[in-house]
UniProtKB/Swiss-Prot annotation:
Higher expression in cerebellum than in whole brain and lower expression in medulloblastoma. Haploinsufficiency of KCTD11 may be a cause of development of medulloblastoma (MDB). MDB is a malignant, invasive embryonal tumor of the cerebellum with a preferential manifestation in children. An allelic deletion involving genes from chromosome region 17p11.2-pter, sometimes restricted to 17p13.2-13.3, occurs in up to 50% of MDB. The BTB domain is required for growth-suppressing properties. It comes from Homo sapiens (Human). This is BTB/POZ domain-containing protein KCTD11. The lineage of its organism: Eukaryota, Metazoa, Chordata, Craniata, Vertebrata. The keyword DNA repair does not apply. SUPFAM superfamilies: POZ domain. One of its GO terms (biological process) is neuroblast proliferation. It comes from the Eukaryota. Signal peptide: none annotated. InterPro entries: KCTD11/21_C, SKP1/BTB/POZ_sf, T1-type_BTB. One of its GO terms (molecular function) is transferase activity.
Length: 232
């Protein structure tokens, strides 16, 4: 296994690839794996402050049978205990831009009719100082990559639900796309501001935040367009 490759005196079979020249190729990469390689090189566990993927790192270490790394992870977790949530701020706001879209609808073999429908485009801006919570929000909305630079607390989304009157071909031609949430088997479309902010509220509460302010009407959460959460 991987640990044996870095230990002297461990017999290893020769490379079966005649062009390999006796070198081994490690077919693995990722944020967790870099810490495994650092541990094997340096002989110590050196994780960045606030590292929150020890469970994934432990699973990788167990898969590769790196017992010293497993022991180091156990010592780290025992020394840390249950970490207390750190103070953080989460702000989410949504704007909607309606527009009238005109298109030709086919009503018969040689009969076309000019139709129009309103399409609402939603733009959501999220700001969160807790990177773990921000990552959970991205995962909740199925965003694998986006315009959020590495380490930035900002996250932006834009989507436009398709009205039933608008043909799918016209919807695609306009370059519009829906927004979905939920896991496999329970996916549901985010059709407007209330459903989007409801998902944000769920994630915020799961990460220890509490609702601090509602805009524009503090008494009307369901029809709000901006929410602010804090965690002390």
């Amino acid at each position: 296994m991987l640990g044996a490759m870095f230990r002297a005196g461990t017999p290893m079979p020769p490379n079966l690839n005649s062009q390999g020249g006796g070198h081994y190729f490690i077919d693995r990469d990722g944020k967790a794996f870099r810490h495994i390689l650092n541990f094997l090189r340096l002989g110590r566990l050196d994780l960045p402050r606030g590292y929150g993927e020890t469970a994934l790192l432990r699973a990788e270490a167990d898969f590769y049978q790196i017992r010293p790394l497993l022991d180091a992870l156990r010592e780290l977790e025992a020394s840390q205990g249950t970490p207390a949530p750190t103070a953080a701020l989460l702000h989410a706001d949504v704007d909607v831009s309606p527009r009238l879209v005109h298109f030709s609808a086919r009503r018969g073999p040689h009969h076309y009719e000019l139709s129009s429908v309103q399409v609402d485009t939603f733009r959501a801006n999220l700001f969160c100082t807790d990177s773990e919570c921000l990552g959970a929000l991205r995962a909740r909305f199925g965003v694998a990559s986006g315009d959020r630079a590495e380490g930035s607390p900002h996250f932006h989304l834009e989507w436009a639900p398709r009205p039933v009157e608008l043909p799918e071909v016209e919807y695609g031609r306009l370059g519009l796309q829906p927004l979905w949430t939920g896991g496999p088997g329970e996916r549901r479309e985010v059709v407007g501001t209330p459903s989007f902010l409801e998902e944000v509220l769920r994630v915020a509460l799961e990460h220890g935040f509490r609702l601090d302010s509602v805009f524009p009407d503090p008494e009307d959460l369901l029809n709000s367009r901006s929410l602010r959460f804090v965690r002390h």
